[in-house]
């Protein structure tokens, strides 16, 4: 049964990144995916740049499997008309489902595009998380 409450719409470019982190933290894949355009790309920097990566859903599910909160700090937003580049720092810290400590952090670069209704959705997202526990979620 679909969720009767629609996920929020990003009013600003940085909001789309924040809403993804909140949805992943809450284990809500549908709400996280709602922030991405159809056909969006989420590239994990640890992957071969020329290779086929996971789908957005697969990458976000891998993060959600940690069952830990994702925090984000915005570093810069560069706006060019209906497109924006959002640079951020993301952090995941806690004890994973296997009772092992997880401490991941790293940079993110996100291209966000204004939609016809005025909201913003992610077209391209690149995450690099590293640190102790990086083997469990290399995003």
Stretch-by-stretch model annotation:
Residues 1-38, 134-139:
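Short, low-complexity N-terminal intrinsically disordered segments enriched in polar/charged residues
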Residues 93-103:
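Short, cysteine-centered beta-strand-loop-beta hairpins and adjacent loop/turn segments enriched
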């Amino acid at each position: 049964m679909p969720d009767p409450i629609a996920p929020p719409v990003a009013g600003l470019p940085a909001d789309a990144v924040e809403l993804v982190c909140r949805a992943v933290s809450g284990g809500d894949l549908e709400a996280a995916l709602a922030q991405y355009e159809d056909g969006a790309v989420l590239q994990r920097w640890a992957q071969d740049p020329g290779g086929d990566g996971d789908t957005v859903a697969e990458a976000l599910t891998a993060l959600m499997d940690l069952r830990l909160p994702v925090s984000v700090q915005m570093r810069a937003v560069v706006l060019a008309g209906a497109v924006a580049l959002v640079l951020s720092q993301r952090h995941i810290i806690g004890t994973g489902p296997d009772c092992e400590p997880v401490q991941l952090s790293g940079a993110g670069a996100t291209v966000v595009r204004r939609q016809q209704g005025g909201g913003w959705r992610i077209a391209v997202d690149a995450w690099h998380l590293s640190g102790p526990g990086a083997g469990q979620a290399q995003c």
